[in-house]
């Protein structure tokens, strides 16, 4: 499928929505070595996602899950079940911080991960990726009243930049702006708290994530776009991770993503979860990882 451009404005965050047949788990039994498709056929799938990212992966006060990654994962699992003639399985959610994603997959603690999981060459050495299912770009979150930061270059004045352990955005900034001081936390929500308290000067990660926080704490923060030589600072392709060399599972995920685009579900989920106020999000081309050749 050729890449299709879908434009969405990230704004209102989808309210808490109870998901039928979905439960949360801190650990949970794994279907491990049986493979991703076997887990679906057996009726229980452990899915990793974020618990603290509004509009993408969020555990709500009533313990239901909401967000684009949550909805995409649920669609993929159930679409594969429908295609195979199986019953829809129970989905058990597992929190998957950035630094733990590969380990959770390799240890069989989850069957798949949809957690703002940017595909890159290093990660592809240890896990398989279905997708990509969207393309976003790196940006900055700063305090609303802080006028020191309007461009990427403004960080190169000894300012403190926050990101999450195991994620790549902050190091990419450090590579081009050596004067930046890095501060890492385990979760983006911890970075947001540090930013609000003035302990860091900016948070960097994907624009999709940052607009979710900007909307959740409306009036407290603003998003600053990042460019290099007039182009987006980075391209971030989100994929669905599963065990290395599970090609059958990978192919099934890609086919489900194609169905999600074709029936209009992806555009609907974008609008429901991320609203219509800012930032361009582009559909991915499932199975096309040619961008890794340039990384």
From Swiss-Prot:
Alphabetical list of InterPro entries matching this protein: Bact_solute-bind_prot3 (IPR051455), SBP_3_CS (IPR018313), Solute-binding_3/MltF_N (IPR001638)
KW Cell membrane (keyword) present: yes
The record's subcellular locations are: Cell membrane
Entry's Gene Ontology BP terms: amino acid transport
Signal sequence, renumbered to the chain: 1-26
Q: Main localisation, per the record?
A: membrane
Alphabetically ordered keywords of this record: Amino-acid transport, Cell membrane, Lipoprotein, Membrane, Palmitate, Signal, Transport
List cellular component terms (GO).
Answer: extracellular region; outer membrane-bounded periplasmic space; plasma membrane
Q: How is its activity regulated?
A: Binding of glutamate or asparatate induces a higher thermal stability of the protein structure.
Q: How does it sit in the membrane?
A: Lipid-anchor
Lipid-modified sites (N-palmitoyl cysteine): 27
Q: What happens when the gene is disrupted?
A: Deletion of the gluABCD cluster almost abolishes glutamate uptake activity.
Q: Where is the lipid attached (S-diacylglycerol cysteine)?
A: 27
Q: Name one Pfam family in it.
A: SBP_bac_3
Stated family:
Belongs to the bacterial solute-binding protein 3 family.
Quaternary state and partners of this protein? The complex is composed of two ATP-binding proteins (GluA), two transmembrane proteins (GluC and GluD) and a solute-binding protein (GluB).
| Role according to the record | Part of the ABC transporter complex GluABCD involved in glutamate uptake. Binds glutamate with a high affinity. Also binds aspartate with high affinity, suggesting that GluB could be involved in the transport of both amino acid residues into the cell.
Name this polypeptide is given? Glutamate-binding protein GluB
The gene for this chain is: gluB
